UniProtKB/Swiss-Prot annotation:
The lineage of its organism: Bacteria, Bacillati, Bacillota, Bacilli, Bacillales. Keywords: Cell membrane, Membrane, Transmembrane, Transmembrane helix. It comes from Bacillus subtilis (strain 168). This is Uncharacterized membrane protein YtpI. It is found in: Cell membrane. InterPro entries: YtpI. The gene is ytpI. It comes from the Bacteria. The chain crosses the membrane at residues 1-21, 54-74. One of its GO terms (cellular component) is plasma membrane. Signal peptide: none annotated. It is a multi-pass membrane protein. Its main location: membrane.
Length: 100
């Protein structure tokens, strides 16, 4: 259970880090990449929280709510990953063009 608490805290730190980095970023593609990374971090936070609740408490309501959190968190992390994979090559081309 301590591992899940550590992962929840780490996910929260990454979420805040990428949100702040996204606000401070100048190019729009860099903002989109930071937004995608923060979406992955928030999704993992919700997923780990749901998993932690399911392990700690064994009532039917907790299992249902934990399952919902796991599904929502996994969906958010997956959507963030897909967005990151979409924007990363575009950002690399833009950076290559700017430095050439």
């Amino acid at each position: 259970m301590l591992v899940l608490v550590f992962l929840i805290g780490l996910s929260a730190c990454f979420y805040v880090y990428y949100k702040v980095k996204g606000v401070r970023a100048k190019p729009s593609l860099a903002k989109e990449i930071c937004s995608a990374k923060s979406s992955m971090a928030l999704g993992s936070l919700v997923l780990f929280y749901g998993l932690n609740q399911m392990i700690l408490f064994h009532s039917v309501l907790t299992l249902v709510i934990g399952g919902i959190f796991i599904v929502i968190g996994a969906g958010s992390a997956w959507a963030g990953y897909k967005a990151f994979r979409h924007y990363n090559p575009l950002h690399a081309k833009e950076a290559e063009r700017d430095h050439a």
